[in-house]
Amino acid sequence: MNFLPKSRKARRRLTILAVAAPVVALAVGLALWGMRDAISLFYTPAQAAAAHVPAGRKVQLGGLVKAGSVVKHPDGLVEFVVADQRSTALVHYKGDLPDLFREGQGIVASGAFDESGTFVANQVLAKHDERYMPREVAKALKEQGEWRGDGQAPSYQGYKPGKPNT
């Protein structure tokens, strides 16, 4: 019983397909493997807590800076809490904050969680006017049913400075 096509043209096409398919699959696999460190997933604090993001994994954390949570240390370390009404995350950032960074406003921080669950940011991006919300933050808030299109800052109940509510 012969499974190969009878015509020479069909056998040639099958041979080319049998050689090309694994080569293309290998190329796509290598490209994705090479980009694994460049891919940065976006989470809100609640999503990060639910997903149990492993320590050291590069992610973006977005939400609103909780009022009264910003602490600037003499060594240049800035500590603040990012919240999304369901959960909060403590963020440490060493460096200069954007000029538009302020409490009650939306931010997106890039970095990784450490072993203690603190988000260590290497970059902080702030919204640029009263009406703008970073796309990822707005989408996440809409999915959670917490979106406020009127620009009002949400109120946070039960917040204690220095300790994130999770």
Curated annotation (Swiss-Prot):
GO molecular function, one term: heme binding
Signal peptide residues on this chain, from the entry's feature table: none
A GO CC term assigned to this protein in UniProt: plasma membrane
Keywords noted in UniProt: Cell inner membrane, Cell membrane, Cytochrome c-type biogenesis, Heme, Iron, Membrane, Metal-binding, Signal-anchor, Transmembrane, Transmembrane helix
Periplasmic side: 35-166
Sequence ranges on the Cytoplasmic membrane side: 1-13
Intracellular or extracellular location(s): Cell inner membrane
Membrane topology listed for this record: Single-pass type II membrane protein
Annotated residues for binding of heme: H128, Y132
Protein function: Heme chaperone required for the biogenesis of c-type cytochromes. Transiently binds heme delivered by CcmC and transfers the heme to apo-cytochromes in a process facilitated by CcmF and CcmH.
Protein name listed in UniProt: Cytochrome c-type biogenesis protein CcmE
Species for this entry: Caulobacter sp. (strain K31)
